[in-house]
């Protein structure tokens, strides 16, 4: 085993160096953080949440202008729309897979609407969807 190196006692600095005055600390601006990897003035980005609340409210005002909606009812309606869209997307994906097509087109969506929604509701949804696609392609 190698011999251990001898440790020398730390040398003391002369008193004169300690007596020097340190510069005063700069005044800090509130809100500006100076840290390791942080950028100045940047706040944590808020995670965006997509909802259908504004569209539900617009439709409600078209149908019944004098009626309001509670936040709990709005949340239920938002969940309902998400569930329906999820079912339609799953059915459209299944149809595309059956037909060995890599793309979901308006035809798959239309067929999935006919399969998922009952009777009269499916007919109205298909007619409104066809009208929307026609308007989109013509513009």
UniProtKB/Swiss-Prot annotation:
Can be acetylated to form H2BK6ac and H2BK33ac. Monoubiquitinated by BRE1 to form H2BK143ub1 and deubiquitinated by UBP26. Required for heterochromatic histone H3 di- and trimethylation at H3K4me. May give a specific tag for epigenetic transcriptional activation. The keyword Nucleus applies. There is a cross-link at residue 135 (Glycyl lysine isopeptide (Lys-Gly) (interchain with G-Cter in ubiquitin)). GO terms for molecular function: DNA binding; protein heterodimerization activity; structural constituent of chromatin. Residues 1-47 are annotated as: Disordered. The keyword Acetylation applies. The modification N6-acetyllysine is found at residues 7, 27. The nucleosome is a histone octamer containing two molecules each of H2A, H2B, H3 and H4 assembled in one H3-H4 heterotetramer and two H2A-H2B heterodimers. The octamer wraps approximately 147 bp of DNA. Belongs to the histone H2B family. This is Histone H2B.11. It comes from Oryza sativa subsp. indica (Rice). The lineage of its organism: Eukaryota, Viridiplantae, Streptophyta, Embryophyta, Tracheophyta. The gene is H2B.11.
């Amino acid at each position: 085993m190698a011999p251990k190196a001898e440790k020398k006692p730390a040398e003391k600095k002369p008193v004169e160096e300690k007596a020097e005055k340190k510069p005063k600390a700069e005044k800090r601006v509130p809100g500006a953080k100076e840290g390791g990897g942080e950028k100045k003035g940047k706040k944590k980005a808020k995670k965006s949440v997509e909802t259908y609340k504004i569209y539900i409210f617009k439709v409600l005002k078209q149908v019944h202008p004098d009626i309001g909606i509670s936040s709990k009812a709005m949340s239920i309606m938002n969940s309902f729309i998400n569930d329906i869209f999820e079912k339609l997307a799953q059915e459209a994906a299944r149809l595309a897979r059956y037909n060995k097509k890599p793309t979901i087109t308006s035809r798959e969506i239309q067929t999935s609407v006919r399969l998922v929604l009952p009777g009269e509701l499916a007919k109205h949804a298909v007619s409104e969807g066809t009208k929307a696609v026609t308007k989109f392609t013509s513009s």
